[in-house]
Amino acid sequence: MKRQIKKIESLKEIAPLIAAVQIRDIRLVEAGVSTSVRSATEAGEIKFEVATSADVKEYNKDEGIFWVLAQIKIRLIPVEPEKDAVVSVSAAFEIKYSLPKELRASQKQLNTFARINGVFNAWPYWREFVQNMVARMNLPTITLPVFRLEDTTKIRRKKPDKNIR
């Protein structure tokens, strides 16, 4: 229950930012893909494991521009225990946001915004990237669910792998 209360307070704290920011640019800055199988049959039944993180990388107060680095990694792992991941896809997206001139934000507010909205805003690009990469591996298409602030799908968010930069 305390976690839910904290999320609500965090959302209230950044509500003016959420209502006012604009995305100016989003670009892929790092990516990695790998597979250990040649077919869906070889992979067997799988489940998703997703790790996300996002941080403010730079804030130019004079211009009202800030950049967020959103990192996402998915591992498709067999349902059978003792087997390694069959597919791993990681990506980092840099998102450039602008604030209206009259709105000033503290570093704490920007960091909270980055953690909540950074991944949320990168998610559609991420979904397309994963779908494209898995198809290029000649494996069946994977359609990831929409991103939710609360985890209501099979996706489990964990701390990101230290290899994601």
Which ranges hold each PLM region?
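N-terminal intrinsically disordered, cationic/polar leader segments
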Residues: M1-N121, E128, N132-R165
